Amino acid sequence: MGSFNTSFEDGFILVGFSDWPQLEPILFVFIFIFYSLTLFGNTIIIALSWLDLRLHTPMYFFLSHLSLLDLCFTTSTVPQLLINLCGVDRTITRGGCVAQLFIYLALGSTECVLLVVMAFDRYAAVCRPLHYMAIMHPHLCQTLAIASWGAGFVNSLIQTGLAMAMPLCGHRLNHFFCEMPVFLKLACADTEGTEAKMFVARVIVVAVPAALILGSYVHIAHAVLRVKSTAGRRKAFGTCGSHLLVVFLFYGSAIYTYLQSIHNYSEREGKFVALFYTIITPILNPLIYTLRNKDVKGALWKVLWRGRDSG
């Protein structure tokens, strides 16, 4: 059997949710609605971050990057999934599969790193308020954003390269998109060495950022407890709790998928877990981080009234 870059010229078959045909129409409706709302919500955040000068702050700078990531991240898999659920075409070309694997891993890895940067930004705002603007100056913000994107794409390049070097036995991918654990399941040769290399990269990109975020929020919680106002503490803990919910869903599902042994990985369960970080998290991010925020609501009304007056 040849290696991935010479095998299966006709591509792969994505099994998707065809094992549950009665579930496919329901999934199609819900996923289509969630995808539409994700596009709408994240596009609004990006537009407002550019249009309203009051949102030209470090926090909204990173949030606009997160929204762009979520737009691209969900678009790298969901359109293919919707086609799959319709049963029109369950195939994907070899080149398309490689491109999807690379883009998906790059964007997912970038989001893992960017969420750490955003946690650091919140830590600086809450725990070092007097020095916040000095710490989070524009040059540092741009550097951190570029570093996040760079780290994500480097990680994806490494893991995609390792995947392409594996010989595969079969062309049926028991998933709704080209995901790494499914390729490892198809590998003909012993993948222990490849798995070890991938595991190190995943610990750096997934586990370490998750630990850093939790550490940041421990410091934030400690600072909030010193706030004398009960209402202020309640508001701060409510915000932190919402942020941690997104972190838990995103990193929890990613850890389940990427940090367990391939021998313990269940393809049937993996498909449903993947829905959390491909469908659920991208729609929660704009709702939790920004659309409930008074500044964002004010900016949105300002833009809407400006458009109404000009009309």
From Swiss-Prot:
Top-level taxon: Eukaryota
UniProt keywords, alphabetically: Cell membrane, Disulfide bond, G-protein coupled receptor, Glycoprotein, Membrane, Olfaction, Receptor, Sensory transduction, Transducer, Transmembrane, Transmembrane helix
Stretches of the chain found on the membrane's Extracellular side: 1-25, 80-100, 159-194, 259-271
Compartments reported by the entry: Cell membrane
InterPro entries, alphabetized: GPCR_Rhodpsn, GPCR_Rhodpsn_7TM, Olfact_rcpt
Disulfide bond annotation, renumbered to this chain: C97-C188
Residues in the Cytoplasmic compartment per record: 50-57, 121-139, 219-235, 292-311
Membrane topology: Multi-pass membrane protein
Pfam families with a match to the protein in the record: 7tm_4 (PF13853)
Main subcellular location of this protein, as a coarse class: membrane
Listed transmembrane segments: 26-49, 58-79, 101-120, 140-158, 195-218, 236-258, 272-291
GO cellular component entries: plasma membrane
Annotated glycosylation sites: N5, N264
Entry GO MF terms: G protein-coupled receptor activity; olfactory receptor activity
Gene Ontology biological process terms from the UniProt entry: detection of chemical stimulus involved in sensory perception of smell
UniProt similarity note: Belongs to the G-protein coupled receptor 1 family.
Physiological role: Odorant receptor.
Protein name (record): Olfactory receptor 2Y1
